[in-house]
């Protein structure tokens, strides 16, 4: 593990960990999923780095074919675990899923900002933050959304899990392809366009 990644993780997690002693109940649980996303990002970074150093894959091939698989599986693990073990209410499952994605995206953007300091302009940094941040949130939210149905039916549980993961992996891969194309704006607009339907659904289902 690179010392830089560990230091960034500690610097981000240490202040947030103080809130664990203040929050109670559902708030503490949701914060726990934020931590899970942050940790999974650091873990995914190590796996992706191993692929990069031990194979002849190009950056384009790696980001389109490998990292979506690694990252989406790791992000989905906490969501799948609580869906099948604790069987929470759909609203809580959706909130937990998006918090894992947000935690992952936050850690990833901090690492990108640290490693690319001076190489990216302000517009590129902001665009990357919005695009990748929302993409990770939406892809994990999609898994949580699918789990609200799959976890309620034994017949759908295994097939639903595979379908949810496959969808999030393909979505992630399409995003990575778009942002590296000649029209990166399409990649940035993709998560924005897909987040809106989820937002409307959650607000509609939320108890008054």
Indicate where each model-derived feature is located.
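Hydrophobic alpha-helical segments at protein termini of multi-pass membrane proteins
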Residues: 1-208
């Amino acid at each position: 593990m690179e010392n830089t990644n560990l230091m960034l993780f500690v610097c981000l997690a240490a202040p947030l960990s103080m809130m664990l002693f203040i929050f109670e109940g559902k708030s503490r649980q949701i914060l726990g999923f934020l931590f899970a996303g942050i940790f999974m990002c650091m873990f995914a970074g190590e796996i992706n780095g191993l692929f990069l150093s031990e194979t002849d894959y190009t950056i384009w091939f790696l980001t389109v074919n490998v990292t979506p698989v690694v990252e989406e599986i790791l992000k989905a693990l906490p969501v799948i675990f609580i869906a099948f073990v604790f069987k929470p209410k759909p609203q809580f499952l959706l909130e937990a899923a998006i918090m894992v994605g947000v935690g992952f995206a936050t850690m990833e953007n901090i690492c990108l900002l640290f490693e690319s300091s001076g190489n990216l302009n302000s517009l590129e940094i902001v665009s990357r933050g919005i695009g990748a941040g929302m993409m990770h949130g939406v892809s994990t939210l999609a898994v949580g959304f699918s789990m609200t149905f799959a976890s309620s039916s034994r017949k759908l549980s295994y097939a639903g899990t595979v379908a949810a993961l496959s969808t999030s992996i393909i979505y992630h891969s399409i995003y990575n392809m778009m942002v590296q194309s000649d029209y990166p704006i399409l990649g940035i607009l993709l998560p924005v366009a897909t987040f809106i339907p989820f937002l409307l659904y959650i607000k509609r289902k939320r108890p008054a």
